[in-house]
Amino acid sequence: MAVNVYSTSVTSENLSRHDMLAWVNDSLHLNYTKIEQLCSGAAYCQFMDMLFPGCVHLRKVKFQAKLEHEYIHNFKVLQAAFKKMGVDKIIPVEKLVKGKFQDNFEFIQWFKKFFDANYDGKDYNPLLARQGQDVAPPPNPGDQIFNKSKKLIGTAVPQRTSPTGPKNMQTSGRLSNVAPPCILRKNPPSARNGGHETDAQILELNQQLVDLKLTVDGLEKERDFYFSKLRDIELICQEHESENSPVISGIIGILYATEEGFAPPEDDEIEEHQQEDQDEY
């Protein structure tokens, strides 16, 4: 069973963010660059495998997780390992998976103390344990792709010599319209300086667009997943609404709550839109 650690106060023994990253990377043979990358939960699962061999099935860990529901899955695996080894620590999953620095830094500080209290110095091969899988997803893949794309499009791609139209109109057009490679290559490389470099940039942008589409698809699946759960909760509440239970009433109030200034559509408007949709078919 594990030795529990309850102290969370800041002391001289606390490592800086750089030292903490160095410890994580050296211990697990990773290449993390930010504390926020710990939000996937994969590193903690492997640390538990290092401390208590057999308490975690590493095959269940999504080492290449990129979406929030995948992070949650990894933390569920970690919670199961904590329960199995008698670790009393409550994992703030909802905060950690958001990828915020402060929440993840506080948790890794506690985990480092927990690790030091339980590690017996035995040899461990992290690459062999995870079978060579990469464990370095960005905390927010969508944001990273957006930011990188804007930077490259706004500064790296040469502009046309046409006197009409400001530069920002050209760059925004490229970003808002997801164009295939043939459209992005309007000007031949020979007509511009640094043609080969521009070709490489175009290929990179096309790959980023593909990655962005995959991210959006994943977010849509995640949205549908949680919407389905909310719908199931709504149906259960409606079945017991006649019981006048304050709990049921409270849940229904939360489900139907709207932001200030938002007006839900009237029934006749909904019927009108439904009729229009049927007419189209």
Curated annotation (Swiss-Prot):
Matching Pfam families: CH, EB1
Listed GO MF terms: identical protein binding; microtubule binding; microtubule plus-end binding; protein serine/threonine kinase activator activity; protein serine/threonine kinase binding
Tissue: Predominantly expressed in brain and muscle.
Region (DCTN1-binding) residue spans: 217-281
Modified residues annotated as Phosphoserine in this record: 162, 176
Residue ranges occupied by any Calponin-homology (CH) domain in the UniProt entry: 14-116
SUPFAM superfamilies hit by this protein: Calponin-homology domain, CH-domain, EB1 dimerisation domain-like
Subcellular location: Cytoplasm, Cytoskeleton
Domain EB1 C-terminal: 194-264
Function as written in the Swiss-Prot or TrEMBL entry: Plus-end tracking protein (+TIP) that binds to the plus-end of microtubules and regulates the dynamics of the microtubule cytoskeleton. Promotes microtubule growth. May be involved in spindle function by stabilizing microtubules and anchoring them at centrosomes. Also acts as a regulator of minus-end microtubule organization: interacts with the complex formed by AKAP9 and PDE4DIP, leading to recruit CAMSAP2 to the Golgi apparatus, thereby tethering non-centrosomal minus-end microtubules to the Golgi, an important step for polarized cell movement.
Domain characteristics, as noted in the entry: Composed of two functionally independent domains. The N-terminal domain forms a hydrophobic cleft involved in microtubule binding and the C-terminal is involved in the formation of mutually exclusive complexes with APC and DCTN1.
Protein name: Microtubule-associated protein RP/EB family member 3
Organism of this sequence: Homo sapiens
